[in-house]
Every structure is written in structure tokens, then in C-alpha cells.
Amino acid sequence: MVSLEKNDRLMLARQLPLKSVALILAGGRGTRLKDLTNKRAKPAVHFGGKFRIIDFALSNCLNSGIRRIGVITQYQSHTLVQHIQRGWSLFSEEMNEFVDLLPAQQRMQGENWYRGTADAVTQNLDIIRRYKAEYVVILAGDHIYKQDYSRMLIDHVEKGARCTVACMPVPIKEATAFGVMAVDESEKIIDFVEKPANPPAMPGDDSKALASMGIYVFDADYLYELLAADDKDDASSHDFGKDIIPKITREGMAYAHPFPLSCVQSDPDAEPYWRDVGTLEAYWKANLDLASVTPELDMYDQNWPIRTHMESLPPAKFVQDRSGSHGMTLNSLVSGGCIISGSVVVQSVLFPRVRINSFCNIDSAVLLPEVWVGRSCRLRRCIIDRACIIPEGMVIGENAEEDARRFYRSEEGIVLVTREMLRKLQVKQER
């Protein structure tokens, strides 16, 4: 392990990102988000009033100084590709900066799509090698967090690692959804199990397990060797968590990087923020938290801005209707182009161009872009998908049986409404 002086670390913080390429795995289906991902990949799902989930990984790259980025796409990629083309065309080709869209090459006989996360990189190796990077940063495109990847790169170099895995403690009950590791005193990974049925607890804390975040730094040449060998292994599932990381661990070449060392947060005493938002409840909670008085995720930090595609929209408007009722909101996010007329909105997130007509009560709701809510509606604990038209007088979130019959209701009581569900409901009512 190499110990670096402060000036050396500052120099590396500038140099290492320039020697790196980031690969964002953005082809996931996100099946636990149910109908919300029927027509879009999970990284393209709207989040936080104006963003897409992938904007966080892309913004982290930009803010960390990594300006060579490959986005590996697959499932329902049109919306994602369109978003990146419109909102992330700021890089200069003359300066060797880019966001490259890398669809499935479908080069394997008998295989149409990527066989696993590692295969997603393998299929694009011919392109990736042309980047001539010394380090490859592998990222998931479907997580919400702020991280300075330059700090993780410095940690990788200091430890003399060939592979570094970002990690953080998670409740033991949630650890079955992650790769779980054990480390020694030097943070070398000595054991790694992907999504174990009985996760091993952290030493000294039976309530937590040390989980992989799916964020990796590799020496480029080492990664290429690993992927070439994995590609020829018929017994492999060609996945980083299931195959590549366990193999490196057995070889003693993998080190852990504690997420708090590179997490970007304005309050140093706050808990490091990282969310998977892979279920409807997690997605709903993470959105509504941003509307709270003190959100866990600081979206107002000008030193680490989250970038996205910005439409030219008029300001949000709150108006009095003809009866004299005022449009009001409390503890809510209301985006550009929204109009709230004579209704009350509480603890909710309204995406661009939402229209709420008179006499409505909106409470703990997430309304995606272009939702239109008719008069006298009551919406509670729900997610309304893009461009839904909620009929006059409709009540959602108050009757569990009725909600489950008409829409999708999760075990936690979160109701998801889509245009297709509303269309089917209308057909039934017209019979």
C-alpha cells in the first residue's frame, strides 16, 4: 500500500479521472417497479421532480472529472437514448470527451442480448479498448447517490489494487439483495457471496452486512484479461457479482472502498445517501423525502449539481378558481409548467406540466410529467405515470380493495396508476 501526501492526492484527483473511462450499465428492466418500467428502462425512470435516475451516475462522472463515458443499453432503450442525446451533448470531441451509447452487439450465435453484466462489457470490448484508458470505472445506472469517483480512484491506486469495490453497511434483512463481502484489516476482500440467503454479519454488529454497491474500479488491462477468460467459460453466468468479483477475491486481488470516503454530502455528520429505488415503495419514499423540510439527499448543493435535460417551460402557477378557492401547496416539489387551480397539494412531487383542476386534494403523491387531474379528485399514497388523465371525482388511495381491483396496489399500500390501467377501467365502465 502506498501512502500519499496531500499534494500528491490533489494531483491524482485531477489526473486519474483523465486516465479513466466510465461504463454505465443501463440496460436493466427494473421488474420490481412493475408497470412503471413496461415501456422504459429503469435508468430512464423519472425521479425528483425533473430528473431521470441515470442523471445521477452521469452527473457524478462529470463532477468527478471523468469525461469519457460509455452507456451500455438494452431493454426498452428508446426513452433513455433520447434523454441522453438531448440532455448530455455537452462534451467536446476535440478534447476526447464523449458519452457513447453502446447497445447490445448481439454477436453471440444463439444469443440475442447480454448474458449478464460482465457480458455487457465484453460485447463492447472492441469499442472500449479504443478509449485507451488505464482505469475502467463500472457503474450501475439505476441508483440514486452522489459520489466523487476521483476519491475512489485514489484509494484504488494507494492500495495497489487491481480491482476495487465500493461498499457500505446495510441492514442484514436487506442484504439478500446485494453481494456481501468480508474484509481484513487492510480492506482486502477475503470473501464475497452474491445475494446470499443467509448474509454473513459484519464483525461486531450482527444487525448489518457489508454490501457491494455495484460500483467497481479496475485496472483496464486486468479487466480485459478477466473478461476474455470469462467469455470462454461455459459454466459462468457472465456476471460481475456472481462470477468476476468472487474470482478476483479468490485470487486476493480485490479491495473494498468504504462509500463514506467518497460520498458527496453538504452535511459531514449526515448518513451517506445511496438508494436503489428498485421497488415502488422505495421509489415513492425517495421521491417524497425530497419534499420534506430536511431531505436526506441534498439537491441544492451548487458544488455538486445534478444535470439533466432542461425543457423551456413557464414557471409553476397556483391560481384561484372561479369559486374563490386558492391553489395551495405544503412541503411539496412543483416543477415548471404545472398549474394548480383551487386545490390543495401536500407532501407530494409534481413533475413538469402537471395540471390539477379545482376542488382536488393531493396528499403523499408522485405525479409524473403531463398528468391531468380532473375536478374533485382525491389522490393519496400513489404514483401516477406519465400523461395519465385522472377522471373527475376519482378517489385513489383510500379504499384498498377498490385500488387493487382497478390499479396495482403494493403490499405496503402504494398505488400505481398507468394509462393502460385507466384505459381498461374505462372499457369496463362502458360495458
UniProtKB/Swiss-Prot annotation:
Domain of life, source organism: Bacteria
Inhibition and activation profile: Allosterically activated by fructose-1,6-bisphosphate (F16BP) and inhibited by AMP.
Classification via InterPro entries: ADP-Glc_PPase, ADP_Glu_pyroP_CS, GlgC_bac, GlmU/GlgC-like_hexapep, NTP_transferase_dom, Nucleotide-diphossugar_trans, Trimer_LpxA-like_sf
Keyword terms: Allosteric enzyme, ATP-binding, Carbohydrate metabolism, Glycogen biosynthesis, Glycogen metabolism, Nucleotide-binding, Nucleotidyltransferase, Transferase
Keyword Zinc appears in the UniProt entry: no
Site (Could play a key role in the communication between the regulatory and the substrate sites): Q74, W113
SUPFAM superfamilies referenced in this protein's UniProt entry, alphabetically: Nucleotide-diphospho-sugar transferases (SSF53448), Trimeric LpxA-like enzymes (SSF51161)
Enzyme class, broadest EC rank: transferase
Record-listed E.C. numbers: 2.7.7.27
Pathway(s) where this gene product acts: Glycan biosynthesis; glycogen biosynthesis
Residues noted as binding AMP in the record, renumbered to the chain: R40, H46, R52, R130, E370, R386
Annotated alpha-D-glucose 1-phosphate binding sites: Y114, G179, E194, K195, S212
Summary of the function given for this chain in its UniProt record: Involved in the biosynthesis of ADP-glucose, a building block required for the elongation reactions to produce glycogen. Catalyzes the reaction between ATP and alpha-D-glucose 1-phosphate (G1P) to produce pyrophosphate and ADP-Glc.
This protein's name: Glucose-1-phosphate adenylyltransferase
Organism field: Salmonella arizonae (strain ATCC BAA-731 / CDC346-86 / RSK2980)
Phylogenetic placement of the source organism: Bacteria, Pseudomonadati, Pseudomonadota, Gammaproteobacteria, Enterobacterales
